[in-house]
Design a protein with these regions (language model features):
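Generic structural signal of hydrophobic/aromatic residues within well-ordered alpha-helices
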Residues: 9-12, 46, 167
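S-adenosyl-L-methionine-dependent methyltransferase catalytic module, highlighting the catalytic core
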Residues: 101-111, 116-219
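Class I SAM-dependent methyltransferase Rossmann-like catalytic core
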Residues: 1-21
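Short N-terminal helix-initiation segments at or just after the protein's N-terminus
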Residues: 1-8, 33-40, 153-163
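Conserved SAM-binding loop
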Residues: 22-132, 144-147, 216-217
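A general structural signal for short secondary-structure junctions and capping/turn motifs
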Residues: 14-18, 49-50, 204-206
Length: 219
């Protein structure tokens, strides 16, 4: 999650009173080390303000990791029932939809977790290179496409957010990264898919990464 993305989430969450948010499920939460150590702005901008307003946050991930409150697979009916039993009023679904083969299925399962009036805070890359963790389907929707995916909801707020970060930032820290592109340039036949990804990444030397951010209410 980018710093600008975390700041946007803070503002989006602050637009609602605590009783509209609590309990809140943070889907695909990753570990406490990621939230507080590697990307501490997630904790500072999102979860500290929520706790200050007495919003109960439940961190959910399919992996057993430190800081995960509920280990659950969002494609498993039994796990979905366990999550639904928590009676969440809101969900964070951040940078998940591009990591599943069937984003429409994941969207349906997310909607099934909340009752009518439940809130979904969704972020997904809009302009960003391939990043496998563990997979990336290159799903890059705009807000309208995201609204089509989450049918049965009302779009309350959305933006395509500039992060102020680009591939230049990585290259400044590790200039040798450019050597990878130079090495691959004349040999696309070795692995054409990897060659395409390598050449495409150069676009973000000039362009910033952008994120689709949206808030939905279940009808």
């Amino acid at each position: 999650m980018f710093k600008a993305e975390a700041r946007w989430l803070r503002c989006a969450l602050e637009a609602f009173p605590p009783e509209r948010l609590s309990p809140l499920l943070n889907l695909g939460s990753s570990s406490v080390e990621v939230r507080e150590g590697i990307q501490p702005w997630i904790e500072d901008q999102v979860f500290i303000p929520l706790r200050a307003r007495n919003v109960e946050v439940v961190h959910v991930d399919m992996r057993e990791l430190p800081g995960v409150d509920v280990q659950a697979d969002l494609t498993d009916p039994a796990d979905l029932r366990r999550l639904r039993a928590l009676r969440p009023r809101a969900l964070l679904c951040c940078n998940l939809l591009e990591r599943v083969i069937e984003p429409d299925r994941l969207a349906r399962h997310c909607l099934d977790l909340v009752a009518a009036g439940g809130l979904l805070f969704v972020t997904v890359p809009f302009s960003y290179p391939y990043h496998s963790d563990p997979i990336d389907t290159m799903y890059r929707p705009n807000p309208a496409q995201l609204a089509e995916l989450l049918c049965g909801t009302r779009l309350l707020d959305s933006t395509i957010l500039g992060t102020g970060v680009s591939y230049r930032n990585a290259v400044r820290k590790r200039p040798w990264l450019l050597l990878r592109h130079l090495w691959r340039l004349p040999i696309p036949f070795v692995s054409f898919e990897k060659w395409q990804r390598s050449m495409a990444r150069l676009y973000w030397l000039a362009a910033e990464y952008r994120i689709t951010c949206a808030v939905f209410e279940k009808l």
